[in-house]
Amino acid sequence: MSFEVLEKLEAKIQTAVDTIALLQMEVEELKEEKQQLQNEAQELREAREALEQRAQQVQQEHAAWQERIRSLLGKMEDVE
């Protein structure tokens, strides 16, 4: 093989190595981003569950107050 062919081959190999290194860095960045998104998704799920529980609690409180009001109105009608 001639010296020129070896130089071209070396340049191609170096380009491939550089490309692989860049791709590895990109993969690491994507892994970190994925982990951050998974964490954020988990936090959002937990927040949604907390809101759903609070909404259910408020509905129960609302129903209890409605029942109390009905009871008081019934007592007022009995007094009249």
Swiss-Prot record:
A GO CC term assigned to this protein in UniProt: cytoplasm
Keywords: Cell cycle, Cell division, Coiled coil, Cytoplasm, Septation
Location in or out of the cell: Cytoplasm
GO biological process, any: FtsZ-dependent cytokinesis
Pfam families the record matches: ZapB (PF06005)
Coiled coil: 3-80
InterPro entries: Cell_div_ZapB
Gene3D superfamilies, sorted: 1.20.5.340
Family membership: Belongs to the ZapB family.
Quaternary structure (record): Homodimer. The ends of the coiled-coil dimer bind to each other, forming polymers. Interacts with FtsZ.
Functional note: Non-essential, abundant cell division factor that is required for proper Z-ring formation. It is recruited early to the divisome by direct interaction with FtsZ, stimulating Z-ring assembly and thereby promoting cell division earlier in the cell cycle. Its recruitment to the Z-ring requires functional FtsA or ZipA.
Name of the protein this chain belongs to: Cell division protein ZapB
Organism: Vibrio cholerae serotype O1 (strain ATCC 39315 / El Tor Inaba N16961)
Lineage: Bacteria, Pseudomonadati, Pseudomonadota, Gammaproteobacteria, Vibrionales
